[in-house]
Amino acid sequence: MSDRIPALQMYTVRELAERDMLGTLAQVAGMGYRAVEFAGYGGIGLGRLRSTLDEVGLRAIGAHVPLWHWMERGDQVLEELHTLGCSYAVAPSPPDDVRMDEQGAWDIAKMLNGCGERCRAAGLRFAYHNHADEFASAGKSSLWEVMMERTDPELVEFELDLYWAEYAGVDAAELLDRHPGRVPLVHVKDMAAGPGKEDRPVGDGTLPWDRLLHAAARAGTTGYIVEQDDAVDPLRDSATSLKNLQRMLQ
């Protein structure tokens, strides 16, 4: 699995990045990361941001772009992604005004197909990122499965957050095995033991990484993106995750 790409979702270090995006990118590169995924740009001009990526040896694997941005400023979104050299645009969550039920999943799937069509026409790939809510029941399936079934595989891919799937009681490895070719990206963080199931650096928790990473490899996943929502020490935890992830992917 040595050809897999570890990356850092910059949301993990968001407070540092809000104060000093460019300096934080340099620190991320100094840990050994070679790719990042953005969740906002820290108010920095995108040309300058791209120059910094090039200078420190990082590439933007993608960026999280809320679905409403496509409705209000889609052309600008595409221009931003191209400037940064992103491969993927990722919808990070459903719109706030869509109910998380089966009809809502159909509505989201329709939006995703539309965004995916715009991205494909612009030479980009489009994916959807989950949390736990997408694994609520929808008939005999889950909302995530409904979105998977109702989206065009030529237009829409998925960024499966392994932690949130497992948090919801879903076997994430089995999900990957059921959907080969649809999940090019995964988000990785670990889960603490106990009822709180707090997130932890990769390798410092209870998730079955050998099983998960082999399932991801079988599914054709190439991007392994560290994202810790509530890191105790964001830089230290990001470095720990990278060290452990690199060892696991060898």
Predicted features and spans:
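Active-site surface patch of divalent metal-dependent phosphodiester/phosphate bond hydrolases
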Residues: S51-R59, V65-P66
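Active-site mouth loops of central-metabolism enzymes
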Residues: A7-R19, A63-M71, V98-G104, P201
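Glycine-rich, proline-tolerant flexible connector loops at the mouths of alpha/beta enzymes
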Residues: E37-D54
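A short acidic, amphipathic alpha-helical/loop segment
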Residues: R48-T52, Q76-V77, D171-R178
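Active-site acidic/histidine proton-transfer and metal-coordination neighborhood
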Residues: A26, A35, G42, L67-F158, ...
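Short phosphate-binding/catalytic loops that engage adenosine nucleotides
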Residues: Y33, L58, L124, T221
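Histidine-acidic metal/acid-base catalytic patches
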Residues: M1-G30, H82-G85, S141-L160, W164-Q250
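A cross-family glycoside hydrolase active-site/sugar-binding cleft signature
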Residues: A7-Y11, E37-A39, I61-P66, V90-P92, ...
